[in-house]
């Protein structure tokens, strides 16, 4: 019998000052989590949180197992050699993402990393036993603690340095097989998040450091989300802003004129340029110099031309260049390369070894103003193909934004929302299997690298996202499927023997029926117990008080309005019905 009087249970009147997110505040106040030695990004899970995580984990495992995936468990401590094979050791150690250590000192010491992800470990496991196409496809997953050296851990469980994740890896002989598993995982993730009571969207996404081709994120919609989602209901389109595509509006009209070079001293922005020249910002071509950073090659200068009223999407630029990262060139680099200040660089700037790119917004643009590679000078009424201006290679490098027209439904405009990433699915292709030699013999007997998929869920982040969406002024509103307990029994006065005995008998009936039940038998005032029950968010509260003399108990749905008095003899049936109703409402979201 789970008695609160003999449980390690604690609540706080106020959340610590450093807690900003609602989920962080409530999970701290309700005793679900505690920071370890005051360290940002490290949290211990209390008994209540562990129950929530177990239920989330069960849902995740049920949906994964239903697709035919097999659960395994891989090493958290991973030798540097396998990460060097894939080419990611430099990436993850240079930016400090991975926690690293050595097993000794001197030249013989071996380097290791605490796994932020497990592509390399899984590839090493599989390549030792994969021989034939007849063994494919298969899908391995784990629910495992991960480590990531977040530079700015914040919002409690939303962004931590140690967290629980479900990560799965599938292996295939053909693209069609990979596509089939990808679709199955899309459905499984949709089921998972619906069962957990979340309001979410699946959006097209960038693959980031994981790499690969196709990619979708599953985003919980909430105000503290660090990601921006752009969507169009008319087209059923949704994408992370890093990936989103839109139709750029036509440039403003401009009067007739002819090519000329004009003095524009002291300007620093396109707004100043437009005002001084008397032209619309949408008729300006700005030329921005970046530096592309590569793992195995020297940095390269990159010159990007884009319309004055648009902004470069650096994720798209990095993907187009297939480089580790991009950064803006500083004034010293500009001075060395082209001897001109920012704002006056032209699309034809004579930079040695430069990669020239143009965003789609300037393709076809006419009568524009742009830099002339000379300080304090701009050219006006310029056109591609005239006066030595050659349109660079065109690519989608624009940052889509709310209000842009949808590329799939041009009559509709994109809307935006904030989201927290809970899941991410990728088509990796041979990004890891080729360098790590995860090979199989095809039907002709020739060795081929296996095609891979990768599928992650933030198991410990998920409850925090639920709390962000499901709470009120009194505390948490857990969905019935993942609540730490489904029912809390509250004898109003445990000193009254009849109340205590009735509560214990009802507890036994409920647990025999498979209902997770907590008995709050603390010698506290009923009001204190009610406040704690609301704070920790148990969906159903049953009070056994003075009405018990008339054979009645009080049942209240958390956040569901007034309590209802029912005969004690009917309480079990009533509670079963309420749980069924709450489950049905959750599944229909």
UniProtKB/Swiss-Prot annotation:
Q: How does it assemble?
A: Homodimer.
Q: Which GO terms describe its cellular component?
A: cytosol
Domain comment from the record reads as follows:
Consists of three domains: the N-terminal catalytic domain, the editing domain and the C-terminal anticodon-binding domain.
This protein's name: Proline--tRNA ligase
Q: Which reaction does it catalyse?
A: tRNA(Pro) + L-proline + ATP = L-prolyl-tRNA(Pro) + AMP + diphosphate
- Would the keyword Aminoacyl-tRNA synthetase be found if you checked this record's keyword annotation? yes
Say if the entry is tagged with keyword Cytoplasm.
yes
Q: Which organism is it from?
A: Gloeobacter violaceus (strain ATCC 29082 / PCC 7421)
User: What is an annotated GO biological process for this record, any one?
Assistant: prolyl-tRNA aminoacylation
Instruction: State the family named in the UniProt similarity comment for this chain.
Output: Belongs to the class-II aminoacyl-tRNA synthetase family. ProS type 1 subfamily.
What EC number(s) does this enzyme carry?
Answer: 6.1.1.15
Among InterPro entries, the record links this protein to:
aa-tRNA-synt_IIb, aa-tRNA-synth_II, aa-tRNA-synth_II/BPL/LPL, Anticodon-bd, Anticodon-bd_dom_sf, Pro-tRNA-ligase_IIa, Pro-tRNA-synth_IIa_bac-type, Pro-tRNA-Synthase_IIa_type1
As for what it does, the entry says:
Catalyzes the attachment of proline to tRNA(Pro) in a two-step reaction: proline is first activated by ATP to form Pro-AMP and then transferred to the acceptor end of tRNA(Pro). As ProRS can inadvertently accommodate and process non-cognate amino acids such as alanine and cysteine, to avoid such errors it has two additional distinct editing activities against alanine. One activity is designated as 'pretransfer' editing and involves the tRNA(Pro)-independent hydrolysis of activated Ala-AMP.
Q: Which UniProt keywords apply?
A: Aminoacyl-tRNA synthetase, ATP-binding, Cytoplasm, Ligase, Nucleotide-binding, Protein biosynthesis
Pfam family of this protein, just one? Answer: tRNA_edit
The record's section on SUPFAM superfamilies has: Class II aaRS ABD-related, Class II aaRS and biotin synthetases, YbaK/ProRS associated domain
Give GO terms: molecular function aspect only. Answer: aminoacyl-tRNA deacylase activity; ATP binding; proline-tRNA ligase activity
Taxonomy of the source species: Bacteria, Bacillati, Cyanobacteriota, Cyanophyceae, Gloeobacterales
Q: Where in the cell is it found?
A: Cytoplasm
